[in-house]
C-alpha cells in the first residue's frame, strides 16, 4: 500500500516526465508517435521510481524504451531541475512498457466470446489444463 507521500511524489514525477518526454518528441520533430506516462510508483524508501510508459504505435515500443533507457541520465537531470524545489533527492528511474491495455483487450475478447471453444474445437488445446 502506497503512502500519501509516495503518491504525491509519484504524481509530481509523472506530470513532469510527461512534459519532458513530449517536449523531446516535439523538439526532435518526431511525428506519428505518442508517449504517455500511465503510472509512476515510488518505493517505500523513495529511492526508486518505476515509470510505466504507454507508446502508440505499439510496434515502436521496444525501440522507444531502449532510447529512453539510454538517455535516462539526461531525463533524470531535466527532472531534477524541474522538481528541485519540491524534492531533495530525485529517485532513480526505472522505465517499463505498460501492457495493461493489451491485457484488457485479451480479457474483453475472451468475455465477448470471439474465441469460443464450442464452435471452434481447435481452441480446446489452449484451454486444457496440464
UniProtKB/Swiss-Prot annotation:
UniProt similarity note: Belongs to the RbfA family.
Keywords from the UniProt entry: Cytoplasm, Ribosome biogenesis
UniProt GO cellular component terms: cytosol
Protein's GO biological process: maturation of SSU-rRNA
Function of the molecule: One of several proteins that assist in the late maturation steps of the functional core of the 30S ribosomal subunit. Associates with free 30S ribosomal subunits (but not with 30S subunits that are part of 70S ribosomes or polysomes). Required for efficient processing of 16S rRNA. May interact with the 5'-terminal helix region of 16S rRNA.
Keyword Cytoplasm: yes
GO molecular function, one term: ribosomal small subunit binding
Compartment(s) of residence: Cytoplasm
Subunit description: Monomer. Binds 30S ribosomal subunits, but not 50S ribosomal subunits or 70S ribosomes.
Protein name: Ribosome-binding factor A
Keyword NAD found: no
Amino acid at each position: 500500500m502506497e503512502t500519501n507521500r509516495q503518491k504525491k511524489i509519484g504524481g509530481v514525477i509523472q506530470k513532469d516526465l510527461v512534459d519532458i518526454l513530449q517536449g523531446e518528441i516535439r523538439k526532435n520533430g518526431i511525428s506519428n508517435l505518442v508517449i504517455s506516462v500511465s503510472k509512476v510508483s515510488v518505493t517505500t524508501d523513495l529511492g526508486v521510481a518505476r515509470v510505466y510508459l504507454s507508446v502508440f504505435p505499439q510496434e515502436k515500443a521496444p525501440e522507444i524504451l531502449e532510447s529512453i533507457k539510454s538517455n535516462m541520465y539526461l531525463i533524470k537531470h531535466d527532472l531534477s531541475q524541474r522538481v528541485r524545489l519540491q524534492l531533495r533527492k530525485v529517485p532513480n528511474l526505472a522505465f517499463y512498457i505498460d501492457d495493461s491495455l493489451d491485457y484488457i483487450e485479451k480479457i474483453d475478447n475472451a468475455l465477448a466470446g470471439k474465441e469460443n471453444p464450442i464452435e471452434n474445437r481447435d481452441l480446446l488445446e489452449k484451454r486444457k489444463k496440464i
